[in-house]
Amino acid sequence: MHAGAFINFVWALSLVSLLAAVPPSPSFSLKNLPSTACRLPPAVSEKRCRTPDGSICSGRGSCDCGICLCEVKEAGKYYGPLCECHDWVCHTYDGQVCAGHGQCDCGVCKCDVGWSGEACQYPTTCDLTRKKSNEMCKNSQAVICSNAGTCQCGRCKCENSDNSGLIYGKYCECDDTECFDDETQEICGGHGKCYCGNCYCEAGWHGDKCEFQCDITPWEIKKRCTSPDGKICSNRGTCVCGECTCHDVDPTGDWGDIHGDTCECDERNCKSVYDRYSDDFCSGHGQCNCGRCDCKDGWTGRKCEHPRACALSIEESKKKCQGSASQPCSGRGKCECGQCTCFPPGDSKVYGKNCECDDRQCEDLEGKICGEHGTCSCGRCICEAGWFGKLCQHERKCNMTEEESKSQCESDDGILCSGKGSCHCGKCICSPQEWYVSGEFCECDDRDCDKHDGLICTGNGICNCGNCECWEGWNGNACEIWLGSEYP
């Protein structure tokens, strides 16, 4: 063996022997490694995370041993030592952060060359005449800067002498001082946020200033606010004590014409180019109905942007669509140049040259067709042998005595079928001569249901004892709002 190699071998052998002689320490384990727990007292940790206004991590994160761990939101992110910075913090003008003429740097707009102002909305040089400048500063009522600011080179500078920033908007139309609660002196009573003078309350609070606490269960609140597509307020509003408060303004400053019991209608879909200060719906050739354009005769397209060639006059077109019905397309479709497009588009349940057949009329409230005892033909049930009734819901054979049957047909007031029908095998058969009578005991009057275009529930739902139960794709008190896909 080489001398150098022999020396290394002897050294290694000695080291192994030395380590073997050391007794194992029973106390050595990962648990005995130095602790990573915070050594700061809780008070000191919180102090390091507290902002000058007293909030922990600006209310946008959690404090971990004196260090702020900022939350990450889908619409942007919080950052900074105290989570004080956010993509939304900077001022906006005309729907754009820093007016599109600068960069947002932790709540302050850094303006490009040639622009100034808290939102970089003012050009440093102006080549407009005073008349032209004032015209550009007028709101929809022709008032310059809503009498809440001054006009500078065609742009409004809102009066905020205390630098509160509570008056803002392209035309200084927003005044958040209206959100102050006179009693608590807090914005929205401390239970909501203010956008353009309107309070948007936190869950469990409601009122103009979020001053009232809700007294119904969370389950009932959610149920009332769930939109037809299963979302809370259609993701376009806030659920407040079972009622949807639709967002008129989103966090970027953009306005939305949003309405409906569950904020299901968004009128922005009716504008070819969205401008929150414009009323140019449906290209000027139609009416916006819950975010869908109903075009005037002679126009077509999702936003009525295309002229339609038709050789028929308006009256000739309607007459051709009406046929023998009382209304064009039987009130169940759209008439275009003498041809009916039935509601809902692509649904085979409504059909016919004039949309005269509506097989939805064969469904009961549980969705069964003709009570599963018959077939539907053009909206009328053809019952199997042994069954009868409008929806084939009555069996001809009966194993009850007459007394047993009558006892089940009496309402709480002791009257048989409310005096508006006959009793068969324990069930009321409402008088066919009085078409509007319905209900388990013939106690309901379908004439109480809301109408639209002269039709109960607009023909798009079932009247259930005074309330319209709308079919899929329809909404509104009279089922007059179509929420489904656009016409082909």
Swiss-Prot record:
Q: Where are the X repeats?
A: 449-488
Residues making up the signal peptide according to the UniProt record: 1-21
Tell me the compartments it is located in.
Secreted
Q: A GO term (biological process) for this protein? A: cell migration
Per the database record, which ranges form the I-EGF domain? 38-84, 85-121, 126-173, 174-211, 214-264, 265-305, 310-356, 357-393, 398-443, 444-480
Outline the VII repeats, range by range.
321-361
Q: Which keywords appear in this protein's UniProt record, sorted alphabetically?
A: Disulfide bond, EGF-like domain, Glycoprotein, Repeat, Secreted, Signal
Matches recorded under Pfam families:
EGF_2 (PF07974), EGF_integrin (PF23105)
Start-end of the II repeats? 90-136
Q: Which InterPro entries match?
A: EGF-like_dom, EGF_extracell, Integrin_bsu
Reading the lineage from the top rank, the first entry is Eukaryota
GO annotations of cellular component type = cell surface; extracellular region; focal adhesion; integrin complex
- VI repeat start and end residues: 270-320
- Give the glycosylated residues: N399
Spans of the VIII repeats are: 362-408
Repeat positions for V: 225-269
| Chief localisation class | secreted
Per the record, the domain comment is:
Contains ten tandem EGF-like repeats strikingly similar to those found in the cysteine rich 'stalk-like' structure of integrin beta-subunits.
Name the UniProt record assigns to this protein = Integrin beta-like protein 1
- Provide the species name: Xenopus laevis (African clawed frog)
List the lineage, top down.
Answer: Eukaryota, Metazoa, Chordata, Craniata, Vertebrata
Which gene codes for it? itgbl1
